[in-house]
């Protein structure tokens, strides 16, 4: 049996919690409280997976993947709570975790230091304002107070790019802050901020759309983002029924990668990818809307990050 130390990972004290699949809202609410304190169970080597903030899609997906791993008995997955993509990549490169979720545009200089297990979900950039706000476009953020996601999150990187494409200079034209999602929502609700940017799946229940908040359409910026920063950005729609009672808007989508340390043994990588391939239905939160990438045509689309050899072997066998 391959043990955790074979990966070279170091404990950082932020142990994850493994939960069963009861949907996105349940995972971040009642079920989370009921199952809090449970650790990874079952057999197989231990993989520490850097996920994201409590209440976010990364956190929910990591919990579902850990539960699927426990059922399989071939690998154990321990979810690690983080700020998001950039912190995840740093932890993976430093050997603090064995696997990580990250936005494809956050990989950057780490492309030669990590390997991909699969392209799993589409993240939606969601610009949120209060329902009574007059802000209708990114350009109208000039002179306002905007939260661009927690330090270490993918939204912090992508958000700064969005501002630049819209003709705004971060810090100069906009008062930028970096708060975790729940803190950012509290500030927005209290009138201490004018907008927040969140990169995540839809719906994200914490955003309280349309009860108190609404989404700003950013679809017109997708092409300029691709032209300036590369092909990672897509124009996607958040349908009206994603947030019941809300309105459909277009925004920018970025693929999520499930990444592994280069030192991960091939059999361990294969065990994780088998979960993506053969237990895909159990890995999609029941309330999730929009594009999901857990299918054969999309899972292997991880360029510019090469597939882990163990992952590639599973995909070859699956496709025949």
Where are these regions (language model features)?
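N-terminal secretory signal peptides
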Residues: 1-19, 28-34
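Sec/Tat-exported extracytoplasmic proteins
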Residues: 69, 73, 96, 101-104, ...
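Pocket-flanking alpha-helical
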Residues: 62, 67, 78-114, 182-188, ...
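Extracytoplasmic
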Residues: 44, 74, 112, 122-124, ...
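Segments of small-molecule ligand-sensing domains
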Residues: 249-320
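Pocket-lining segment of extracytoplasmic ligand-binding domains
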Residues: 104-107, 133, 170-264
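Bacterial signal peptide processing site
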Residues: 39-41
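Bilobed "Venus flytrap"/periplasmic-binding protein-like clamshell domains
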Residues: 44-72, 123-190, 281, 297, ...
